[in-house]
Design a protein with these regions (language model features):
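Lipid interaction determinants
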Residues: 1-80, 87-142
Length: 142
């Protein structure tokens, strides 16, 4: 596999937690999109479905005009980051340049990649007990 195989926009179909014993438990529904560009950049935005709207922000994209409580509520469960990507064997490495969680900046997220036509699966490395999560994506427009 190579970088060009991932280029495009992908929408999440679903995610699941896989236990070390092989049992699978679906995770909460999410609204997610990941993009890979031909020149090696990527970004992902992942939010819980059904988030409540905040008070009007006068057309602003940020939440600076909302209350601290509204900002906190809007941010719960949000994962968003961007940076560079590189396919290495059966893995894709996301080198994080900017992120909602500032602790992730400078990290590299490794995901095992499975690609079948317009369907993509990204799996996190297993923890010490063999548990991991995976996200299923479909190429946008397919």
């Amino acid at each position: 596999m190579q970088n060009s195989d991932l280029v495009g926009v992908w929408r999440e179909l679903g995610r699941e937690n896989v236990a070390g014993d092989g049992s699978i438990k679906p995770d909460v529904p999410r609204a997610s999109q990941i993009m890979y560009t031909p020149d090696g950049y990527m970004s992902v935005v992942n939010t819980p479905k059904g988030r409540k709207p905040v008070n009007e922000t006068a057309g602003r994209m940020d939440l600076d005009a909302t209350s601290p409580a509204e900002r906190a509520q809007a941010a719960i469960g949000v994962v968003a980051y961007a940076g560079r990507f590189e396919v290495k064997g059966e893995e894709v490495h996301h080198m994080i340049f900017t992120a909602v969680n500032p602790n992730r900046v400078g990290e590299t997220q490794r995901r095992r990649v499975t690609l079948s036509g317009d369907d993509l699966t990204l799996s996190a490395p297993p923890d010490a007990q063999g548990n991991f999560f995976r996200i299923h994506w479909r190429r946008a427009g397919k």
